Amino acid sequence: MSTTSSRRAFVKGMVAAGAAAGSATLHAQGANRVSGFDHMAVPMQNTDAMVAFYRRLGFQLTENENAVSVYIGTQMINFHRPTRWQDPAFTLRAPAAKPPSGDFCFVWSGSAMELKAMLERAGVKIELGPVDRAGGRRKTGSSTYVRDPDGNLLEFMIYA
């Protein structure tokens, strides 16, 4: 084999190995293309009480015949009305889920004193907190826990 042929074979091998490695890297990086969280859905039982509760807490809501949507920034929680989640024809849900089945953590941008005052104004009893908890931002925050009228757990986390 000539020197030129050897070099060509070497370069071909290196290019092939590089392409394979690059392809594997791209595959590994592209394996999870999830870029954010849009919404979640949970069943609700006490529609009027739930709507009043989330409004008292200052959330923006929309309603339709199937759900009440509570907006948190660019995400939302869809609370399915009983007529929706109890309908056997509605299968796009967790079949065993019944109220209360939610455990939601909201990021609070104010102080602990402001949170406590807001909850008191809304007539909401604090179940626990503030206590330190690990959060989704991969650091510790201060959490305060309450329950909504259906019994779902709401956590308000404050990051320093």
Question: Which residues does each PLM region occupy?
Answer:
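Conserved active-site tyrosine of GNAT-family acetyltransferases
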Residues: 50-55, 119, 151
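Residues at or immediately preceding the N-termini of alpha-helices
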Residues: 7, 47, 111-112, 149
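Mature N-terminal segment immediately following signal peptide/propeptide cleavage
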Residues: 37-45, 56
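Vicinal oxygen chelate
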Residues: 24-35, 57-110, 116-147, 160
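N-terminal secretory signal peptides and thylakoid transit peptides that target proteins
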Residues: 1-18
